[in-house]
Curated annotation (Swiss-Prot):
Family per record: Belongs to the purine/pyrimidine phosphoribosyltransferase family. Archaeal HPRT subfamily.
Record protein name field: HGPRTase-like protein
UniProt keyword list: Purine salvage, Transferase
SUPFAM superfamilies reported for this sequence: PRTase-like (SSF53271)
Taxonomic placement: Archaea, Methanobacteriati, Methanobacteriota, Stenosarchaea group, Halobacteria
InterPro entries reported for this sequence: HGPRTase-like (IPR026597), PRibTrfase_dom (IPR000836), PRTase-like (IPR029057), Pur/Pyrimidine_PRTase (IPR050118)
EC number in record: 2.4.2.-
GO BP annotations, alphabetical order: purine ribonucleoside salvage
């Protein structure tokens, strides 16, 4: 059994309002992230993603950073972090991020027209963050070569009625307070 699958099956579940939320080292930084789990995920991303002619890896703060940093180190592709803080730099683009339980403004720097980017994130759940990121990148004139989320929480999301496509490594749902594996190979 692979480490990602096993770690999800063992993940504790908490409730935020009516939203069942699994607590996992990849999506939350707790419990502790074992190097072997991160290594496994990075290898799976590198194998699944189209990396040909990618200029930059783009990831939303905060929980995509550790994954994307490791992919950047393994591929020598520079990393751009979408921040929740405005810096006012030339070319900075703002976007509104909405998740199942929060809403924030985020800011993209260092992405320009004709850049070819790979977008990486930890979890695709409501699709709010990913949809906002992909729309904002499109508005810059950058080409999104590929998009990968490590974990997809199954069910409808904001990307369903768009032309955005996101690959995932594993798809899960939460039923009766437990993580259930829906597709251990994720979406291609």
């Amino acid at each position: 059994m692979d480490q990602l699958r096993q770690s999800l099956l063992e993940a504790p579940i908490i409730e935020k309002g009516e939203y069942e939320y699994f607590v996992h080292p990849i999506s939350d930084g707790v419990p502790m992230l074992e190097p072997g789990l991160l290594r496994e995920i990075v290898i799976k991303i590198i194998r699944k993603a189209d990396l040909e002619d990618v200029d930059k890896i783009v990831t939303p703060a905060a929980m995509g950073i550790h994954i994307s940093t490791a992919v950047s180190l393994m591929t020598d592709i520079p990393l751009v972090v979408i921040r929740k803080r405005e810096y006012g730099l030339d070319g900075e683009i703002s976007l509104s991020q909405q998740t199942g339980y929060s809403e924030n403004d985020m800011f993209i720097n260092d992405v320009s027209e004709d850049d070819r980017v790979l977008v990486i994130d930890d979890v695709l759940s409501t699709g709010g963050t990913m949809c906002a990121v992909l729309d904002a990148l499109k508005s810059t004139g950058a080409e999104v070569v590929d998009t990968v989320a490590v974990i997809k929480k199954a069910g409808p999301n904001e990307l369903d009625d768009t032309d955005h496509h996101v690959k995932t490594l594993i798809n899960v749902t939460v039923e009766d307070g437990e993580v259930v594996i829906v597709d251990e190979n994720g979406d291609d």
